[in-house]
């Protein structure tokens, strides 16, 4: 089937008075938007910090996502120390729309079925819910793990399962599910200046995949809980027609609670579609109620240790070395022969039921002599809680450090842990460094 102009296709769907406005928006860069990492810093504190720097933010329809209307620093947003320190991350407004519709809560187990590169997983984990972040493709999964590690989200685990198999392997297991489905991404051509065309055959092929993913999500979701479906495209085949197929096939099993198509000229964001389903009954089509979750082989970790003794030892060490006394109650430390990691107690109930690919954030390497050596993610996980072996930086020092520079410091700064220091800005954890003579060696990655 031949490719046709995407803009010509959209023109058939819009009122005449909106066509020109849409075409104009499509050919322009979107305004920069950022999401505040609220599990690290309250939004009001972040606004105060950047306001003092001369930034001008404008509230979007999301409470923790802002347009950046004025940015006064010489560094780019991505190079800024507040980004390197994960006070915020850069996320298009449209990409932030779907995750909040799940209304994630701390005690819930949520599946992000098509998770890479990880922005929506981070949004969901930022609420305190435990997120199973799935990506079957290895290169994309590596990027997903990298982003989760950078943002220190300990309440996450990564799986590498074909999304269409979740319903069969884990029937009625998850409280809520996000299906941010692979799509034609017709709206995304503005990013690369690529050809603005559409391929009907490709779109229909993707729609069949999207339907399979949604069917799997329906089977894997508990009764009376939510499923959110989203795409970054605007055509009907991947959006309204997919939704229609699901609601007709699963009548009495799911109800469509909400759906919206975000258009750039109306909503000041990228093109996006989102739909919210409520599962109201078991799926009699696939007989989910007769399935049972089989015991999974736990992730094999050499010399794995989660003993009560280890929990006490690590907590005592963190208290003695960093004066960290308010460790979250759901924290779970575990060790191997070479490292010590942190996750949450959700792991205790999940590891035998799910085939997990990754479920930890590293805190320390363990030397041959048994000595604990802090690793970079320690600062972001516990930096806000530490008051010993810490050093407060200025904005200028923080930016220099974000640019991978070593910092010259006062020689009389003392540490009690092999010259390691947790760096802070405005009393929030920023980075980890090692003092060598009069310099802080840069360990930002």
What is each of the regions a protein language model found here?
Residues 106-116:
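Conserved class I S-adenosyl-L-methionine
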Residues 128, 139, 174, 178-216, ...:
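Mobile active-site "lid"/loop adjacent to the S-adenosyl-L-methionine
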Residues 117-128:
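Conserved SAM-binding loop of SAM-dependent methyltransferases across substrates and taxa
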Residues 110, 129-134:
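Short beta-strand element of Class I
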Residues 205-206, 211, 215-219, 224-245, ...:
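Class I SAM-binding transferase module
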């Amino acid at each position: 089937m031949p490719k046709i102009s995407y803009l010509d296709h959209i023109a058939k769907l819009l009122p005449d008075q909106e066509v020109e406005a849409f075409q104009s928006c499509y050919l322009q860069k979107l305004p920069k938007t950022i999401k505040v990492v609220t599990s690290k810093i309250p939004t009001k504190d972040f606004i105060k910090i950047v306001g003092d720097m001369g930034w001008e933010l404008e509230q979007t329809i999301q409470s923790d996502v802002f347009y950046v209307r004025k940015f006064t620093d010489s560094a780019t947003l991505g190079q800024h120390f507040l980004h390197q320190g994960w006070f915020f991350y850069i996320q298009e407004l449209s990409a932030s729309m779907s995750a909040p519709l799940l209304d994630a809560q701390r005690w819930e187990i949520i599946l992000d079925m098509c998770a890479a590169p990880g922005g929506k997983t981070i949004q969901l984990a930022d609420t305190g819910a435990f997120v199973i972040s799935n990506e079957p493709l290895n290169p994309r999964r590596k990027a997903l793990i990298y982003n989760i590690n950078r943002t220190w989200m300990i309440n996450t685990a990564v799986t590498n399962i074909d999304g269409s198999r979740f319903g069969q392997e884990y029937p009625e297991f998850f409280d809520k599910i996000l299906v941010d489905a692979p799509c034609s991404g017709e709206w995304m051509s503005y990013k690369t200046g690529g050809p603005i065309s559409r391929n009907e055959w490709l779109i229909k092929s993707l729609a069949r995949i999207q339907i399979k993913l949604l069917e799997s999500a329906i089977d894997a979701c508990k009764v009376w809980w939510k499923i959110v479906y989203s795409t970054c495209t605007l055509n009907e085949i991947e959006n309204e027609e997919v939704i229609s197929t699901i609601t007709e096939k699963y009548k009495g099993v799911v109800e469509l609670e909400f759906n919206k198509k975000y258009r750039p000229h109306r909503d000041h964001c990228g093109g996006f579609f989102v739909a919210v389903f409520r599962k109201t009954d078991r799926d009699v089509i696939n007989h989910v109620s007769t399935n049972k979750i089989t015991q999974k082989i736990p992730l094999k970790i050499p010399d794995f240790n989660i003993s009560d003794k280890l929990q006490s030892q690590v907590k005592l060490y963190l208290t003695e070395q960093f004066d960290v006394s308010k460790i979250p109650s759901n924290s779970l430390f575990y060790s191997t022969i070479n490292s010590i990691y942190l996750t949450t107690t959700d792991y205790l109930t999940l590891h035998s039921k799910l085939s997990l690919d990754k479920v930890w954030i590293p805190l320390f390497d363990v030397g041959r002599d048994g000595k604990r050596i802090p690793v970079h993610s320690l600062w972001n996980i516990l930096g806000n809680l530490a008051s010993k072996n810490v050093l407060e930086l200025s904005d200028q020092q923080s930016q220099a450090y974000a640019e991978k520079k070593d910092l010259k410091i006062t020689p009389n700064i003392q540490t009690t842990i092999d010259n390691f220091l947790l760096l802070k800005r405005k009393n929030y954890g920023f980075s980890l460094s090692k003092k060598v003579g009069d310099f802080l060696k840069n360990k930002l990655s």
